[in-house]
Amino acid sequence: MAAIAVIVTSGAPGRESLIATTLATALGFCYFVQKQKLDELRLFKDLFTDFNRRYDAMNAKLEDIRAGDRRIDSEPRSTLVDYFNLCAEEYLFFKEGYIHRGVWSSWCRGMVYYLRDDRIRQVWNAEMASDSHYGLTLNTIEQDASKR
């Protein structure tokens, strides 16, 4: 807006078109920033909805695994691997700045809940040996679970 003040007080010929151009540029920039923010919010909502839908679909199975006391065989293992992959995807989008800190911390507290079970932790450790989870580690989960 300082540029408009300089143009107005300069008395230069054609200053009206300079004012219009400056205003149009400023408004265009504001629109661009606002649209980008809205697009990011929409992406967050889509990711949040998708991640929660996928978690909800496996929640009962995860609870059954945690409540059980038998060895984890192929079917429960598959559910856990799907869950760990979901957690890794969430982490990837968190690192990229698309998942809010509070949401990520809440999800980490849920991960800690499951990973406290020794049998689930054994499957986690075996999966982490493959190093295919975008750098997500137990240490990261535990640290981020404590953040609000």
State where each predicted segment sits.
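Short hydrophobic membrane-inserting helices
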Residues: 1-24, 130, 143-148
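Alpha-helical transmembrane segments of multipass membrane proteins
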Residues: 4-5, 29, 89-90
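Membrane-proximal alpha-helical anchors
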Residues: 10-77
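Short, hydrophobic/amphipathic alpha-helical patches that form generic packing surfaces
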Residues: 78-95
